[in-house]
């Protein structure tokens, strides 16, 4: 990936990649000199061929990979050395990464309990986010008892339940059929409009 300009707008910059590079072997750069500003409330899609560094860039932003060079800022603060669970970033993976041994409600409660919220707050947030993704009736089901679209909505709800300042999605619709993919694109668009 190469230099990308920031979109026009007056809102504040939420994410900034400054000269970010990533190499796994010390020789070949997967991400080369990425400079990108993402503004608060902006919906941004990274496009490129396989192997161009899209997922690697998301993983560095989320904290699952470390840049070889450069700096990543979140709300004006360097996060290069901040662990993933302290970045206030929700992430939806392509394979959804739901815990198969936990119910939907337990999957949603997990990021809240890790953050030390009390049971009452956890219960309220889980109910609210289940309603948001229209899965109220599925709270006690396990991921294997859900359709692909329902699993995708649970993964999205889990990324939103702790009210992060940023949500990242790595090909979240890739495993869905065309009709469901188009439906979920609209769902994500509506959620973005509501939540910013």
Question: Which residues are covered by each model-predicted region?
Answer:
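Conserved H-loop
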Residues: 196
């Amino acid at each position: 990936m190469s230099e990308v300009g920031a979109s026009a707008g007056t809102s504040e910059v939420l994410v900034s990649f400054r000269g970010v590079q990533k190499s796994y072997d010390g020789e070949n750069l997967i991400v080369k000199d990425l400079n990108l500003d993402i503004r608060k409330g902006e919906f941004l899609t990274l496009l490129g061929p396989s192997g161009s560094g899209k997922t690697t860039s998301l993983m560095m932003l989320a904290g699952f990979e470390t840049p070889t060079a450069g700096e990543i800022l979140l709300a004006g603060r360097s996060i290069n050395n901040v662990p993933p669970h302290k970045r206030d970033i929700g992430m939806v993976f392509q394979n959804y990464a739901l815990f198969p041994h936990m119910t939907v409600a337990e999957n949603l409660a997990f990021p809240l309990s890790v953050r030390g919220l009390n049971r009452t707050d956890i219960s309220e947030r889980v109910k609210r986010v289940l309603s948001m993704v229209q899965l109220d009736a599925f709270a006690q089901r396990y991921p294997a008892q859900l359709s692909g679209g329902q699993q995708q909505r649970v993964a999205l709800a889990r990324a939103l339940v702790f009210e992060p300042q940023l949500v990242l999605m790595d090909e979240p619709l890739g495993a869905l059929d065309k009709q469901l993919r188009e439906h979920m694109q609209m769902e994500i668009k509506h959620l973005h409009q509501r939540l910013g």
